[in-house]
């Protein structure tokens, strides 16, 4: 009886902490251009944060043009109608505006932070609108950026963490675009032409698939004008905004790659969860217990605290439009790589088979909810949430839902979700810096799927 009462009290306290945390009010509408707009009005600071994102990430590359999506985004700020790259930098600097970007397998976008005062805001938005809607993709700049990118790709081929990441993506996703490197391959980047960038931009940077996020010191009427201004002259688009379905792994695989580094870099995982998956919140809490909670996680306790096999070990899910990777990673001395790998695998196997305890669950939920205010404590962080909510068609109540749904996750929810999504016997494993006598060149899981 006392155990049930304790659980009830813990649940009530979680719900109280949830209800006490205020979340921003999100306004949403469709601009005349067809773009979806998400806006939070906040006059605490004389600032405006604006972002425009498109379904134009590396997941929309093709194998023969890997790297195209990233180069297209990168060159938006390198020249637009009436402005070269120096003009863009100077005009933004003159009004104290900061330009940024967002790029992953699903999304590509541009963001800006500016003072909300009329003169500064107008100049910053003029530059941003021109970049988005009148890019030039100058030949000379493209040649220079390709040279820089190829040099970076060659350098990455020497670093064990880069080698491991690339091999892991291929092992988990095979020929699926999620297995491509966002920066591309040396041979594909070398062949990219200006016409490729222009065609990709025209197909993927359309107004009807654009998501505009606005946060800060402006009114609703001003937000409506800004959203239309940033998207009203975008190309028609027309390319699909859907990524191809991801296949589950059909068998386990292990790839050992020799490297002179003193430590082995170990990655293991599989396709995990999409943004829209009903198991998302259960997996989120469960992963906090497994390897996402730092020193309180099981992996850290078993691998570092009890045995000293690694300084750090982690696990995470990457929720995407299609299931992104579930990944466990660590570094350890070469002579203990096999021991560390076996321990990590056994810890995961026990986690999936035996599940989590009520004590672990309560602590994890409390830590997640206590940390929630830090997730929305700046305009920039809220802006990114607006972009995610819009891009993945999440409800406007997502920030409230996040807290409520986390608080309601049960032991049974976590255990069932992990059993559905993670099979410890069917994982892709990559060990870079494996002991030389064990290193081998092998096919990736993607080649045998």
Locate each region found by the language model:
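M16 family metallopeptidases and their MPP-like homologs
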Residues: 40, 45-71, 85-131, 146, ...
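An aromatic/glycine/proline-enriched structural segment found at the starts
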Residues: 182, 187, 207, 211-274, ...
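Boundary at the C-terminal end of the N-terminal hydrophobic targeting segment
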Residues: 20-24
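Bacterial N-terminal signal peptides
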Residues: 8-19
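Short acidic-hydrophobic surface loop/beta-edge motif
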Residues: 27-32, 255-259
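A common structural junction motif
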Residues: 129-137, 230-238, 346-355, 446-449
């Amino acid at each position: 009886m006392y155990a049930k009462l304790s659980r009830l009290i813990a649940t009530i306290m979680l719900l109280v902490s949830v209800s006490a945390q205020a979340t921003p009010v999100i306004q949403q509408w469709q601009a005349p251009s067809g773009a979806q707009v998400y806006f939070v009005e906040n006059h605490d600071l004389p600032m405006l944060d604006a972002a425009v994102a498109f379904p134009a990430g590396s997941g929309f590359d093709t194998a023969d043009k890997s790297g195209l999506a990233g180069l297209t985004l990168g060159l938006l700020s390198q020249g637009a109608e009436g402005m070269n790259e120096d003009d863009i930098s100077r005009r933004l600097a003159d009004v104290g505006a900061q330009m940024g970007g967002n790029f992953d397998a699903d999304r590509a976008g541009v963001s800006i932070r500016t003072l909300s005062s009329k003169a500064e805001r107008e100049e910053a938005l003029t530059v941003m609108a021109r970049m988005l809607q009148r890019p030039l993709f100058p030949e000379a700049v493209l040649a220079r950026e390709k040279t820089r990118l190829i040099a970076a790709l060659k350098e990455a081929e020497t670093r064990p963490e880069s080698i491991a990441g690339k091999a892991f993506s291929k092992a988990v996703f095979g020929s699926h675009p999620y297995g491509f490197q966002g920066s591309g391959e040396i041979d594909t980047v070398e062949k990219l032409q200006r016409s490729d960038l222009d065609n990709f931009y025209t197909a993927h940077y359309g107004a009807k698939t654009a998501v505009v996020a606005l946060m800060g010191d402006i009114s609703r009427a001003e937000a409506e004008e800004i959203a239309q201004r940033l998207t009203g002259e975008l190309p028609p688009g027309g390319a699909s905004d859907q990524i191809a379905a991801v296949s589950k792994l059909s068998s386990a695989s292990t790839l050992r790659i020799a490297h002179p580094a003193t430590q082995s870099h170990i990655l293991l995982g599989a396709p995990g969860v999409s943004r829209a998956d009903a198991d998302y919140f259960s997996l989120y809490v469960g992963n906090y217990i497994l390897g996402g909670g730092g020193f309180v996680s099981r992996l850290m306790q078993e691998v570092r605290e009890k045995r000293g096999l690694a300084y750090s070990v982690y696990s995470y899910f990457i929720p995407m439009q299609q299931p992104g990777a579930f990944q466990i990673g660590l570094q350890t001395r070469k002579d203990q790589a096999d021991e560390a790998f076996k321990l990590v695998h056994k810890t995961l196997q026990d986690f999936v088979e035996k599940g989590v305890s009520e004590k672990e669950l309560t602590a994890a939920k409390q830590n997640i909810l206590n940390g929630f205010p830090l997730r929305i404590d700046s305009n920039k962080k809220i802006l990114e949430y607006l972009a995610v909510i819009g891009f993945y068609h999440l409800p406007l109540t997502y920030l409230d839902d996040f807290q409520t749904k986390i608080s309601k996750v049960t032991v049974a929810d976590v255990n069932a979700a992990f059993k559905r999504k993670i099979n410890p016997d069917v994982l892709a494993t990559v060990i870079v810096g494996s002991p030389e006598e064990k290193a081998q060149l092998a096919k990736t899981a993607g080649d045998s799927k």
